[in-house]
Amino acid sequence: VSGLAEFRSRVEAFLGARYPRRHETLRHGQGDDSLVGAAFRDSDDEAGDLRRARAYQRELFDAGLAWLSGPVEYGGAGLGAAERQAFAEVVRRYDVPDVNGLLVGQQIVAPAVLAHGSADQRARLLPALWSGELVGCQLFSEPDAGSDLASLRTRARQVDGGWRVDGQKVWSSGAHLAHVGELLARTSPDPASRSRGLTMFLLDMESPGVTVRPLRQMTGTAHFCEVFLDDVFVPDDAVLGEVGGGWAVANVSLSSERDNFGDESANLFIRLLDRLLLLGQEVGAAEDPDFRDRLADGYVRHVVNQVLPASLETATPEVATAGTSLVKLFATDADRRLVQLALDVLGPALVADTGAWGTYAWSRVLLGVHATRIAGGTDEIQRNILAERALGLPREPRPVREDRRR
């Protein structure tokens, strides 16, 4: 416990010397009233957010506070879940740059590199991703392969010195700003199993033949992208894991994405909670019993989700893997409940801009928060994982799909 207290003090000292505490900057009617991070902001804001995030991440990395659970030889701190939780609690008290634009590289790409990368890939990429030097993106989903990822159609054919890749990816967060992409492609057909014959590659996003097109979302922003791959050359040393073993690599990334979803959602939740409290005080809802009860209910759900990851550390591998789905379900549910409360308080002012500070700003959150039911694996997929892997229930019948390649 004393060691953990010392760690908290160290984090407090580091952040306190560089950034203001959030309670010192949070005032209703003052400053920018935007509520969301890089995923929902305009493109100019997103690029600026990323610049600030990379500078902040470099500071953390140099101080040994960037990758708390990572191996020391790759720039990590070699610490455990308790320190990670303590850091998260402390950092939420400070007005630090939004690191949303770095999370795919750190929480999806980096775990796969650590688990399956060569010695060179680990030494070269892990410190770069965690210091903010490199920004990563995920190139898994396709127009006809989302939840059913094993049906992907992007192909990689072997040539002298590497591979030539052709295909299309979609819903790739931040691909227009990324340096490296974790790319899943089919390298050989396997009639017995669609998940075999897939290979993972580490794609240089500046490679000739890579075209990235941001997709306009209903929030009005364009954070997600579609990526076209036209005869893109990928060298042999960019294969991540074994040729034909891409499914195992993908599962590492997907499990880590679910596991870390709670951290990302927690940061959003605290921002929304603070602003909702201010809003309630401003419009006179703070004394309403229903408002207070729903606010407390959402916060309790949030706290439960914060302790779930630590409890999973002692679970069996099967339950621990499935438990990451529970983390994601709890996180998205807490966020949606809070946004619904804001909608009930504000009514039409949430969707019609009256010019009042801190009201219409919720509209973009309302539009964006429902995407969390899909991002990182749909709620339905998460429930299937829990049912089949943790509870041992029968597998859901898989529909027979027509082979569209004929």
Question: In which residue ranges do the predicted regions lie?
Answer:
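C-terminal helix-coil-helix/basic helical segment that borders enzyme active sites and/or dimer interfaces
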Residues: R27, A285, P289-R292, V303-A356
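N-terminal glycine-rich flavin-associated loop
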Residues: G101-D120, G146
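A short, Trp-centered hydrophobic/proline-enriched beta-strand micro-motif
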Residues: G132-F140, L183-L184
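Amphipathic, small/basic residue-rich leader segments at the start of a protein or domain
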Residues: V1-L103, R124, A128, T354, ...
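A structural signal for short hydrophobic beta-strand segments in well-ordered beta-sheet cores
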Residues: T154-R157
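Glycine-rich beta->alpha junctions and the first turn(s) of the following alpha-helix
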Residues: V210-Q306, T372
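Glycine-rich phosphate/cofactor-binding loops in nucleotide/flavin-utilizing enzymes
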Residues: A82, A86-F87, I108, V249-V252, ...
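A short core secondary-structure module
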Residues: D166-V212
